[in-house]
């Protein structure tokens, strides 16, 4: 079990399916767990950078995930382009592990605004 309070996943509004009967299996923009081999996750401090790099023009939903309820392996892997290690989930996200699914608003300049959606950086 991970010693962090939450993991995060950015989903496009069109990919987020509120059907709570199936585990969530979208890895990243338009790619499934089956295609990618894992689901891209982030720590709170990584979310805004991922959003800026990949989701700038998308309607986005922030999934907050309880790592204690994730049954598949989570592995932190270096992403040299980002200069950081990101959590990758090698299985689906159980719906019961998703604590919240919150649409991310846009600020006046059009960027995604995570104010109040993420804990303050440590």
Give the residues covered by each predicted segment.
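Conserved, structured core segments of small domains
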Residues: 1-122
């Amino acid at each position: 079990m991970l010693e962090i309070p939450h993991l995060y996943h950015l989903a496009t509004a069109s990919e987020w399916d509120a059907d709570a009967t199936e585990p969530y299996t979208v890895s990243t923009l338009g790619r499934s767990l089956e295609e990618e081999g894992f689901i891209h996750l982030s720590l709170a401090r990584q979310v805004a950078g991922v959003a800026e790099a990949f989701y700038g023009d998308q309607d986005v939903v922030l999934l907050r995930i309880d790592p204690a309820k994730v049954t598949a392996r989570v592995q932190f892997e270096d992403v040299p382009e980002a200069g950081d290690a990101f959590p990758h989930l090698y299985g689906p996200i159980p719906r019961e592990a998703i604590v919240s699914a919150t649409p991310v608003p846009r600020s006046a300049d059009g960027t995604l605004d995570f104010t109040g959606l993420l804990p303050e950086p440590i």
